[in-house]
Amino acid sequence: MNFEHISREDNEIYALIEKELERQQNGIELIASENVASEAVMEAMGSYLTNKYAEGYPGKRYYGGCYVVDGVEEIARERAKELFGAEHANVQPHSGSQANMAVYFTILEHGDTVLGMDLSHGGHLTHGSPVNFSGKLFNFVSYGVDKETEEINYDVVRELAIKHKPKLIVAGASAYSRIIDFKKFREICDEIGAYLMVDMAHIAGLVAAGLHPSPVPYADFVTSTTHKTLRGPRGGLILCKEKYAKDLDKNIFPGMQGGPLMHIIAAKAVCFKEALDPSFKEYMARVVENCKELGEQLVKRGFKLVSNGTDNHLILVDLNNKDITGKDAEKLLDEVGITLNKNTVPNETRSPFVTSGVRIGTAAITTRGFERKDMEEIADIINETIINRDKDLEKYKQRVKALCEKYPLYK
């Protein structure tokens, strides 16, 4: 990208932008919620559209001069509906958290009971964590994974639903590596008369590519981010049945947001177009293939995977048998150029700021071009770095650098 203006006007920020690019170019990105946006997406984010205020919706704005950005938002909405087979799409949420908040405000009253996945078992902050608005405003009851299989036990979910009679059940996760059965969640909701919301932020790309069952036919509302496996800008998205569209839209604007970010909505439209291309399905298939292979290579080196494997773009690694915490593993691997994040594991005994595991994803490295054959080397570097953590790590830094040089970023 051309940074001639910022390099001249604000060299301090320009220097940090260049430093971050260098970090990304020379590092292996394994954070499951990150990806590498295309230059087309980034150009949209940096476009003239950032200048336009557009409170409201296409054809019903509170400002003049919106006839151009109306077209942008209409394209984004139509592409989102086509991509996921949805009746209605709202592309205005600034984030996934705000998308979830908008759904809650559409169908819940303060204090209503909601059933969501426990954060320590793979859920998200907005699925009822007591430190989050969701846990403060609503009465969340949590379900988790089975102690033995480390997968969702739908019989237990049903029992909790019958016992607590939630008005809403939230399906979806931020650290769950297995296929989620949305049909079973729908059946449970129908049995007790509850709404179903699916947070597919992590798996949206897989759903778009047909590599994970779609929640759209089963859920009343589906929320997502656009920057994880969808490989777009940082932002949110909501899909819903047409009968909820009017109430949902007014809970986003004027309910909880003012002006939409039109440059980001344009970038969302670009990413939806990219995801509609047949090549995106091939990309997502490689993401899953790489993730499965990386998991298998780690298992060969004595690592334990939560639920013993993966069906998607991420693996959760239990480090209890490696005599290292998630926090220390994250810091250690960062030193050699591998970024991932500490993560709680089922039956966690440590603080969420320390943890007993790490979460690993392959979306970003696959975008960059990493292939299945590279997963063995990545697993080997991770393993040897942890084993030799008290020794000189320079040779592992060089191995990371050598891998990265094979797959240049933004060149």
Swiss-Prot record:
Subunit structure and binding partners: Homodimer.
PANTHER family: SERINE HYDROXYMETHYLTRANSFERASE, SERINE HYDROXYMETHYLTRANSFERASE 1
UniProt site (Plays an important role in substrate specificity): H227
Pathway named in the protein's UniProt entry: One-carbon metabolism; tetrahydrofolate interconversion; Amino-acid biosynthesis; glycine biosynthesis; glycine from L-serine: step 1/1
Record-given protein name: Serine hydroxymethyltransferase
GO molecular function: glycine hydroxymethyltransferase activity; pyridoxal phosphate binding
Residues where N6-(pyridoxal phosphate)lysine is found: K228
One cellular component term from this protein's GO annotations in UniProt: cytosol
Catalysed reaction equations from the record: (6R)-5,10-methylene-5,6,7,8-tetrahydrofolate + glycine + H2O = (6S)-5,6,7,8-tetrahydrofolate + L-serine
Nuclease listed as a keyword: no
Cofactor(s) the protein needs: pyridoxal 5'-phosphate
Gene name in the database record: glyA
UniProt-listed Gene3D superfamilies: Aspartate Aminotransferase, domain 1, Type I PLP-dependent aspartate aminotransferase-like (Major domain)
Location, primary (coarse class): cytoplasm
Organism the protein comes from: Clostridium botulinum (strain Alaska E43 / Type E3)
Group of enzyme by EC: transferase
